[in-house]
């Protein structure tokens, strides 16, 4: 469960290292984001020479959370960190590589490019 002021690791090579969630998209009453949801973030730390700079406001999709995600078959999956991938307005990632595993729930939200770039889909 990701909410406002949550800090996320960046799971791509866009140049950002850490994000701060400004807003969870999807309605005025929406408080929490889970895997596959889009959030508006501020870049809190970045690598020099990257595609995004510190202070930039970007959109990102959540790819990993420490909160267990329940599946239809009764199993749960959770990760060691909260991570996101910075995306453009057309849902394609800004970076060209994805680090770490992602879940197959991203396929239902049409993030096919992220799934194809990821080294492992759980």
Curated annotation (Swiss-Prot):
SMART domains reported in the protein's UniProt record: Ribosomal_L14 (SM01374)
Any Gene Ontology biological process: translation
GO molecular function: large ribosomal subunit rRNA binding; structural constituent of ribosome
InterPro entries for the chain: Ribosomal_uL14 (IPR000218), Ribosomal_uL14_bac-type (IPR005745), Ribosomal_uL14_CS (IPR019972), Ribosomal_uL14_sf (IPR036853)
UniProt feature coiled coil, ranges: none
Endpoints of the signal sequence: none
Keyword Translocase: no
Gene Ontology CC, one term: cytosolic large ribosomal subunit
Pfam families cross-referenced by the UniProt entry: Ribosomal_L14 (PF00238)
Keywords assigned by UniProt, alphabetized: Ribonucleoprotein, Ribosomal protein, RNA-binding, rRNA-binding
Superkingdom of origin: Bacteria
Assembly and binders: Part of the 50S ribosomal subunit. Forms a cluster with proteins L3 and L19. In the 70S ribosome, L14 and L19 interact and together make contacts with the 16S rRNA in bridges B5 and B8.
UniProt family annotation: Belongs to the universal ribosomal protein uL14 family.
Record's function text: Binds to 23S rRNA. Forms part of two intersubunit bridges in the 70S ribosome.
Name of the protein described by the UniProt record: Large ribosomal subunit protein uL14
Organism from which the protein derives: Finegoldia magna (strain ATCC 29328 / DSM 20472 / WAL 2508)
Gene name tied to this protein: rplN
């Amino acid at each position: 469960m990701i909410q406002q002021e949550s800090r996320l690791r960046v799971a791509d090579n866009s140049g950002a290292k850490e994000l701060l969630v400004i807003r969870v998209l999807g309605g005025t009453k929406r408080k929490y984001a889970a895997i596959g949801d889009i959030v508006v973030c501020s870049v809190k730390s970045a690598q020099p020479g990257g595609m995004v700079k510190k202070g930039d406001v970007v959109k990102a999709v959540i790819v990993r959370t420490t909160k267990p995600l329940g599946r239809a078959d009764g199993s749960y999956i959770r990760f060691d960190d909260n991570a996101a991938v910075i995306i453009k307005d057309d849902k394609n990632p800004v970076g060209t590589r994805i680090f770490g595993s992602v879940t197959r729930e991203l396929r239902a939200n049409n993030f096919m490019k992220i799934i194809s770039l990821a080294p492992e889909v759980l």
